[in-house]
UniProtKB/Swiss-Prot annotation:
Gene expressing this chain: CAMTA3
Protein localization: Nucleus
Protein name: Calmodulin-binding transcription activator 3
Subunit structure: Interacts with SR1IP1. Interacts with DSC1.
Annotated tissue distribution: Expressed in roots, stems, leaves, carpels, and siliques, but not in stigmas or other parts of the flower.
Species per Swiss-Prot/TrEMBL record: Arabidopsis thaliana
Membership in a protein family: Belongs to the CAMTA family.
Pfam family, one: IQ
């Protein structure tokens, strides 16, 4: 049934057809959305219109034209008499809010209205669609006018015949499909589009075609059957027949038939069998007079198989004729039978049946007109008023119409009907909200599939939300939300009640800061949209359900796009200024000092390794920006070479100096990405971990700016990855290079530095046991990024576990030393650390030991859970306080006895017996010294405990960053690139070492060859001498 109540979706809307229909009716939300989303196809007005007429539509840009409402018309004002009184409503397409709508009523002409629409979507919210239209009154007043015309028509048969002719002309051009009626007959008539009442023309249009509209129903409407209802013998859908059709038939004739979804396709209708004869008969009937029609009338109405359109026609003719109760009963029975037959058969009858039933319809009209008994006409009027426009009929009018009638003082009979038949507007509105949830159950579940549970509604609505700000918040942040609306209860009940707001499944208290304004704090939540509504601190929605969005915020120290460029430019300028600075006492490097000359040669060799780089730049075509960068680096190389030689010759600190801002050459090179400046500066005597004025090393600067190549070079040169900067407000205990990289979004660099710091910390531990497991080093370069990151997680986890194991062993050793009070009884450091290595087990007990160890780890993890640990600490603290109170009481109680006994002994023995001074001259300096020694030891222990706690926190943070690196593909790729950089640097070092060794080998081979040549020369010289001697 829920699927049957849903309207068919909007297919393709013809914007031209929509604009042509806008001259005579209000547009629906899907149509307005189509226009606003295609605003590029229309001309946007740059000036406000001057007294636009009814049916005018305009489009404005709110950012360009702010005062587009100044149109020259006199609109209804608020109580102050200055501000235009506009009502606001959010319109829906389906079940989603899509539009803002503002209504204004004319002061002089109350039927003249202005409606302004714009989308809720932020990208298109600046485009405004304004529609001016003069409505023709309300349903109730229209029905009374119809009654008056019916009485006049009963007295004037000629006018009735003319009206009948116009009726037939209207149906010839404005007939609706049978398939459309099959959907509408199962729903109730609703002229509201998301909470605003439409005039008569909109009622007619929405009754025939309700594609894409979002309609709210009450519980009575959902439970009402398709046939029958409160109007005995009539389908509730045909309450629209009470509106005068002669007013809008003329307007509908101007609309093209082929493009309208409510029109009959004339080409298909004419080609249908039996339709041609029907049209010919209709033309002949139109040309006849009323007397000829009455003369050609046939038998009665009892056997008339009425179709929906003929039923609509006959209902109007009933009002224009007199009839008997028997005829009315038979007509009622035939209508019910015809509707049941249509519903059971699926309404598959052809349009031909409609035309074939026209002759029978005319016969029924003539039969009713021949029985002129007018006394029953007033009875029919009362039946229609109390049935079609009674309590059930008025309940179908939406809440916004009643609110408009009450607040704006709408004129006409509709206001009186609302006041007489509606006891509580909020109660009826809430029933409609509940019925909307019930009728669109599948749709609502589909729209709210992101929520854990759909909001629960209370019995009545107590608060109406107009707007709330802000409508979103960042994840992990709490913001103050202001909700503006209207209390639907009295002031006393509002002040007594406890209000709250629901954000998803979290309820937070709300404060009433003014009449209709609530204030609450949005709780922290995951990213996404959650339902937002007001409750009475019972988790039940007592207001409309809106959406609140949580967005993800990128955590960065500053804006990378704007501030990085300016910071880099400033650092470059400071670097050039430092290199260009010359000291007063400049002495060149003397050639006598061999060490300085060798150092100068090494620096020159490293800086000018590629002398042909300028020639390559001239030969190859490169961009102008790259040319400038290369020329700047060549200039900086020359300046750095002369500056390093100058500082080496001066002696003292040498190159380990800082500029006016507190940074040195190594820091500038690391931050700017000048890899060629690192090794010469370090060879010149600057430490790799040389700190600036804030305690930052070169590795800190490289990690801060994300210099992957620089980080690999510094790690290869021996930089310490775990050094801490000076404390600052952002990092009270100092920050590591990993902290700076993570704060700037370089998660891959942070993961690599964290892993490297853990492995470096393990390598510092003096584990002398040969059976100790070794932590795996960096993975092979042929593996994938995911494999490398998983290997890093495994290495970091193993390193952190072993470090914690060492800490526990050391703390256990100190406890033993304190317990026995003798250092000889305690274990040595080497023995304590060697006990950490896993012992060799027998093959038979290995499996059982592993299972026992795994069980112990599970128990420890469960005990170390956050909540359990917190509860344990709270309970322990309470127990310690109780114990302290008890011990203090006991100590004071015993202390009094001791003081009394000591006082007696001191007076009796020391003073009276020995005639001495007693304890009055007693000095406790030795005791004080012992106590001071104990406090110093305790302070040292506290210091070590605090330091170890901070180290453990850093280890946990480093391990968490390595694990989080696996979740982000970009971080894994960055980690992979950094591994490749380190591997390339190591390979280049190995190749250089091999080249140097081969060069030395070649030199040794040359020396051997020379010795052999000398030996050969000696042999050639000795041979003639020996021969001469032999001959002699």
């Amino acid at each position: 049934m829920a699927e049957a109540r849903r309207f068919s979706p909007v297919h393709e809307l013809d914007v031209g057809q929509i604009l042509s229909e806008a001259r005579h009716r209000w547009l629906r939300p899907p149509e307005i959305c189509e226009i606003l989303q295609n605003y590029q196809r229309f001309q946007i007005s740059t000036e406000p219109p001057t007294t636009p007429s009814s049916g005018s539509v305009f489009m404005f840009d709110r950012k360009v034209l702010r005062y587009f409402r100044k149109d020259g018309h006199n609109w209804r004002k608020k109580k102050d008499g200055k501000t235009v009184k506009e009502a606001h409503e959010r319109l829906k397409a389906g079940s989603v809010d899509v539009l803002h709508c503002y209504y204004a009523h004319g002061q002089d002409n109350e039927n003249f209205q202005r409606r302004s629409y714009w989308l809720l979507q932020e990208e298109l919210s600046h485009i405004v669609f304004v529609h001016y239209l003069e409505v023709k009154g309300s349903r109730v007043s229209t029905s009374f006018n119809r009654m008056q015309r019916t009485e006049d028509a009963a007295r004037s048969p000629q006018e009735t015949g003319d009206a009948l002719t116009s009726e037939h002309d209207g149906y010839a051009s404005c007939s609706f499909n049978q398939n459309d009626h099959s959907n509408h007959s199962q729903t109730t008539d609703s002229a509201s589009v998301n909470g605003f009442h439409s005039p008569e023309l909109e009622d007619a249009e929405s009754a025939y075609n309700q594609h894409g509209s979002s309609t709210a129903y009450s519980h009575q409407e959902l439970q009402q059957p398709a046939t029958g209802g409160n109007l005995t013998g009539f389908d509730p859908y045909y309450q629209i027949s009470l509106t005068p059709r002669d007013s809008y038939q003329k307007e509908l004739r101007t609309i093209p038939v082929t493009d309208s979804s409510i029109m009959v396709d004339k080409s298909k209708t004419i080609n249908s069998p039996g339709v041609t004869n029907g049209l010919k008969n209709r033309k002949s009937i139109d040309s006849q007079t009323w007397e000829e029609i009455l003369g050609n009338c046939g038998s009665g109405v009892e056997a008339l198989p009425l179709q929906p359109n003929s039923e609509h026609e006959v209902l109007d003719q009933i009002l224009e004729s007199s009839f008997t109760m028997q005829d009315f009963a038979s007509l009622q029975e035939s209508m019910v039978k015809s509707q049941n037959q249509e519903l059971n058969s699926g309404l598959t009858s052809d349009r031909t049946v409609w035309f074939q039933g026209q002759d029978m319809e005319l016969n029924a009209i003539s039969n009713l007109a021949s029985n002129e008994k007018a006394p029953y006409l007033s009875t029919m009027k009362q039946h229609l008023l109390h049935g079609a426009l009674g309590e059930e009929g008025l309940k179908k009018m939406d809440s916004f119409n009643r609110w408009m009638s009450k607040e704006l003082g709408d004129v006409g009979v509709i206001a009186d009907a609302n006041e007489s038949f509606t006891q509580s507007s909020s109660r009826t509105y809430w029933e409609e909200v509940e019925s909307e949830d019930g009728s669109n159950g599948h749709n609502s579940r589909r729209d709210m599939d992101g929520y854990v549970m759909s909001p629960s509604l209370s019995k009545e609505q107590l608060f109406s939300i107009n707007d709330f700000s802000p409508s979103w918040a960042y994840v992990g942040c709490e913001v103050v939300v202001f909700v503006t609306g209207k209390f639907l209860k009295t002031r006393e009940e509002t002040e007594i009640g406890e209000w709250s707001c629901m954000f998803g499944q979290t309820e937070v208290p709300a404060d009433v800061i003014s009449n209709g304004i609530l204030q609450c704090v949005a709780p922290m939540h995951e990213a996404g949209r959650v339902p937002f509504y007001v409750t009475c601190s019972n988790r039940l929605a007592c207001s409309e359900v809106r959406e609140f969005e949580y967005k993800v915020a990128e955590s960065q120290v500053f804006d990378r796009e704007a501030d990085d460029e300016s910071t880099i430019d400033i650092l470059e300028a400071r670097f050039v200024k430092l290199l260009c600075s010359k000291s007063e006492n400049t002495s060149p490097v003397s050639g006598n000092d061999s060490d300085l000359s060798q150092l100068s040669e090494k620096i020159s060799l490293l800086l000018f390794e590629n002398d042909d780089q300028l020639d390559q730049m001239l030969m190859n075509e490169i961009s102008q920006e790259n040319m400038k960068n290369n020329l700047l680096q060549e200039f900086l190389k020359e300046s750095l070479h002369s500056w390093l030689l100058q500082k080496i010759a001066e002696g003292g600190k040498g190159p380990s100096v800082l500029d006016e801002g507190g940074q040195g050459v190594l820091h500038f090179a690391a931050s700017l990405g000048y890899n060629w400046a690192l090794e010469p500066t370090i060879i010149a005597g600057v430490s790799v971990d040389f700190r600036d004025v804030n305690g930052w090393t070169a590795l800190h600067w490289a990690a801060f700016f994300g210099r992957e190549r620089i980080i690999g070079s510094l790690i290869a040169l021996g930089a310490a990855p775990g050094t801490l900067t000076d404390p600052n407000p952002d990092f009270p205990s100092g920050s590591t290079p990993s902290d700076l990289a993570y704060a700037n979004g370089h998660k891959g660099i942070a993961g690599y530095l964290s892993e490297y710091a853990l492995r470096a910390h393990v390598s510092l531990l003096s584990l002398n046991d040969k059976n100790a497991e070794t932590v795996e080093m960096a993975p092979s370069p042929s593996s994938s990024s995911l494999t490398d990151s998983l290997t890093a997680v495994r290495n970091a986890t193993q390193a952190a576990a072993r470090i914690h194991q060492v800490f526990r062993a050391q703390s256990f050793q100190k406890k033993q030393l304190k317990e026995f009070g003798d250092k000889k009884l305690g274990m040595s450091e080497e023995r304590a650390l060697s006990m950490l290595a896993p012992k060799t087990h027998k093959s038979g007990r290995a499996h059982s030991d592993d299972s026992v160890q795994a069980a112990a780890i599970r128990i420890q993890n469960k005990f170390r859970g956050y909540k359990g640990r917190k509860d344990y600490l709270i309970t322990r603290q309470r127990i310690i306080k109780i114990q302290a109170h008890v011990r203090g009481y006991q100590f004071r109680k015993n202390y009094r006895k001791i003081i009394w006994s000591v006082g007696v002994l001191e007076k009796v023995i020391l003073r009276w017996r020995r005639k001495g001074a007693g304890l009055r001259g007693f000095k406790s300096e030795a005791l004080v010294e012992k106590m001071q020694d104990g406090t110093e030891k305790e302070e040292d222990d506290d210091f070590f405990k605090q330091g170890r706690k901070q180290t453990e926190d850093r280890l946990q943070k480093a391990l968490a960053r390595v694990k989080s690196m696996v979740q982000y593909p970009e971080a894994r790729d960055q980690y992979r690139r950094l591994l490749n950089v380190v591997n390339d640097i190591q390979e280049s070092k190995v190749e250089k070492a091999l080249e140097n060794s081969e060069a030395t080998c070649f030199d040794d081979d040359d020396d051997l060859i020379d010795i052999e040549a000398l030996l050969e020369d000696d042999d050639t010289l000795m041979l003639p001498m020996s021969s001469s001697l032999w001959t002699s």
